[in-house]
Amino acid sequence: MRKKILVVEDDPELVELISFNLRASGFAVGTAADGIDALKKARSILPDLILLDLMLPGLDGFAVCEILRRDAATARIPIVMVTAMSSQFARLTGMEAGATDYITKPFSPKHLVARVQELVAQPATLQPTSSAIS
């Protein structure tokens, strides 16, 4: 089964570039253009990884990340922030919000895909679990 990646980005050209490269590498790709849609789609498709822009309409990426981390269904999905915000403060804020990794724009599509492949290949400790406590 192909791994599912949710791309949360409001720039249509960048969404197309990222989606094309991920699909070419064998991933299934879903997209969202704002924070509210990102939350809905993350909860409905339960992706294996989320690529999350920070500067989004509605809820920003920091808020989206924090909400996803508080939701048991999405708390363990790796989240990679992909943003033009390159300051140390933004990186720290992103990691404190629960990001797994932080990639700044502009980026190499090959580097982005390689990072996604690495993260989705990691053990299930970062992945959502559906086991019930007995």
Which residue ranges define each predicted feature?
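Charged docking surfaces used in two-component/phosphorelay signaling
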Residues: E13-A24
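Active-site residues of response regulator receiver
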Residues: D53, T83
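Conserved acidic carboxylate
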Residues: E9
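Acidic, metal-coordinating helix/loop segments flanking the phosphotransfer/catalytic sites
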Residues: T31-L49
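C-terminal output helix
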Residues: F107-Q117
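The feature encodes the CheY-like receiver
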Residues: V15, P57, A75, S87, ...
